[in-house]
Amino acid sequence: MGEADRYIATGVLKMKTSYVGYRALLVHAHPDDETINNGATMAMYAALGAKVTLVTCTRGEEGEVLVEDHAHKAATLDDLLGEHREIELADAMAALGISDFRFLGAPDFKYRDSGMMETEPNRRTDNFWNVDFERATSQLAAIIDEVKPHILITYDEIGGYGHPDHIQAHRVAMAAADNSSWKIPKIYWNVMPRSVIQEGIDAMAALGSDFMGVDNADDLPFAKDDSFVTAHIDGNDYVEAKMAAMRAHATQIAVDGPFFALSNNLGLQVWGNEYYTLVKGDKSAPFDEAGREVDLFSGVELS
């Protein structure tokens, strides 16, 4: 059976076998955010024929460099990390099968990574946090009108964990969706259910390890009550593509770090399941046993 003919099924709940004509837009803050949050979803829908477009708002110049050979590229040294992460993003998108990926504002504008709140990088006038909001919104609205997505995926109001660029990406994405001529039928925010995170923490603890040094999911700002989850994408058939994309982001995701430790100890399925909350549009069948959508395009009419 070819990739285009594959389907995900839970009992009698089935997704379509082809998504040709369907269009998804994802808006993220830095290279690697898309893979960690949505890699399996992106790979699955792309393999099944959907057009998947990624807009990344910054090049992640202020990120920590986890590879010694590239340490000199850090913002505090040669300041070449952004250029390198462009290459990593291209490699990750190749792994996921995504051909349409762009940076917000390119080629005329470049928004710099803002760093964390109350840091020196956060005070720079060229960073995304201090952006001309109307300009950035207009740039993204133009992409929306070009792509005409049926679904938009981005962060919640706190950007998952409070990073300024994640918060700003959320604000720009939601404002652009409001201001664009094309009205997106369904908008989703990334969400990580508390129960899933706690299961991972407990399983790691049983193996004598930990995840990010915590023993309670409530200590992680991105852990949300399970009631917030309205959609669950089973992308386990595409998790190998997601792992390859994670490896492509080598300066940011260490192979001996917590993300790979989860899959090494608990199995790849820990990264194959991705969760969302629907904030615009109608929740539509098919549903899983918990009443969550199993297809982000459900209920969408092609146009």
What kind of feature is each model-predicted range?
Residues 4-19, 116-117, 178-303:
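C-terminal accessory domains and tails appended to enzymatic cores
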Residues 150-180, 185-195:
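Hydrophobic, aromatic-enriched interface-forming segments
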